[in-house]
Amino acid sequence: MGRFTLPRDLYHGTGSLETLKTLTGKKAIVVVGGGSMKRFGFLDKAVAYLKEAGMEVELFEGVEPDPSVETVMKGAEAMRKFQPDWIVAMGGGSPIDAAKAMWVFYEYPDTTFEEIITPFSFPTLRTKAKFCAIPSTSGTATEVTAFSVITDYHKGIKYPLADFNITPDVAIVDPELAETMPKKLVAHTGMDAMTHAIEAYVSTLH
């Protein structure tokens, strides 16, 4: 038997970032990457919308490309201190992937990274927070999938984490964000999309 899981709500269209105003909660942490979302003004907009929704907002910035286990643990620690009920991941695949893993260790601080390497072995999430993904690139599709890729640089291994629990609750796909991509990145993410299609065909995880 197969299973196909998508976010509960997917908002698409120019200006859909404003949907953040409709989220209900007390605190939101926004996870972002290298600075493009701040540079183009989208981070400030997101924070303003969340505050308009009545939430206290904190940022976790600087998630690197191919996020590391260390970054994930730092983010989870920041979440445990702040205690958000919304995790908002914004940017390319890396900050969204990292935030998914942070989510696990925020809700289950005693869990080890080794325990979640096995596909579909995660503990039940949403005991503390829900997840909203806002992609700024095309190609990774992490905003609508049950997957995350985290790198252990000490071992030199990229770990694909897989569990339906980490499928976002809400995905906001606003094309205004993707329009900021340079041509080279557009090409790279196109290859990413093609690679995902090939992976689905040759995967032994059935």
Model-derived segments and spans:
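A glycine/threonine-rich phosphate-anchoring loop and its flanking beta-alpha core
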Residues: 107-206
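ATP/NTP phosphate-donor binding region
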Residues: 1-86
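Glycine/serine-rich anion-binding loops at beta->alpha junctions
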Residues: 84-100, 136-143
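Short Gly/Thr/Asp-enriched flexible loops that form oxyanion-binding sites at enzyme active sites
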Residues: 74-76, 95-108, 144-145
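General beta-strand structural signal in soluble alpha/beta enzymes
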Residues: 11-12, 58-61, 88, 98, ...
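Acidic, glycine-rich active-site loops and adjacent beta-strand->loop/helix elements
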Residues: 63-67, 94, 102-105, 136-139, ...
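Structural signal for hydrophobic packing residues in well-ordered secondary-structure cores
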Residues: 24, 50, 79, 103-106, ...
